[in-house]
């Protein structure tokens, strides 16, 4: 990028910011496209390494956070549906940016306490459960919790109970 393309802030060129922002925008658009055309539930990019996921719920994010937390640090995520539980895991993982088709109001409240940049198509009062008869169980379980750390403990217990039933 030539200097004529740079923005100056107190006589400092900030070309890198422009280049980085352009790269992130382009990468996020690619992730969103992959999310929708590949039939994935979640797509994550960290420094050019892209992973795709197909499980419903928070299991994939929980596994990443507890087994490979470095992959979430600074990552870009495109996801179809994000409730408060997923939001907590993303915040604790230190993601940089999220695009989601649908986000719950409770998730947005939690994101507002973080540095995560969030773009979405639709904000809804809550996330439905799988058969659309009520709230998602993770959304219900997390609804009154204020901290991402407390939500992590709730999710850990929830996933352990599911695993023990199998």
Predicted regions and their residues:
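Conserved mixed alpha/beta catalytic, RNA-binding, or beta-rich assembly cores of soluble enzyme
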Residues: 28-101, 123, 128-137
């Amino acid at each position: 990028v030539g200097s004529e393309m740079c923005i100056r802030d107190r006589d400092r060129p900030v070309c890198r910011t422009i280049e980085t922002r352009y790269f992130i925008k382009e990468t996020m658009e690619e992730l969103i496209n992959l999310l929708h055309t590949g039939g994935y539930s979640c797509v994550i990019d960290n420094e050019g390494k892209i992973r795709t996921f197909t499980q419903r719920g928070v299991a994939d994010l929980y596994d990443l956070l507890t087994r490979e937390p470095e992959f979430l640090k600074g990552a870009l995520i495109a996801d179809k549906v994000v409730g408060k539980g997923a939001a907590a895991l993303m915040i604790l993982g230190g993601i940089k940016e999220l695009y989601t088709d649908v986000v719950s109001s409770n998730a947005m409240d939690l994101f507002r306490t973080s540095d995560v940049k969030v773009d979405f198509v639709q904000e809804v009062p809550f996330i439905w459960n799988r058969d659309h008869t009520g709230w998602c169980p993770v959304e219900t379980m997390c609804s009154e919790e204020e901290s991402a750390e407390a939500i992590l403990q709730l999710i850990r217990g929830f996933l352990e109970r599911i695993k023990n039933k199998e």
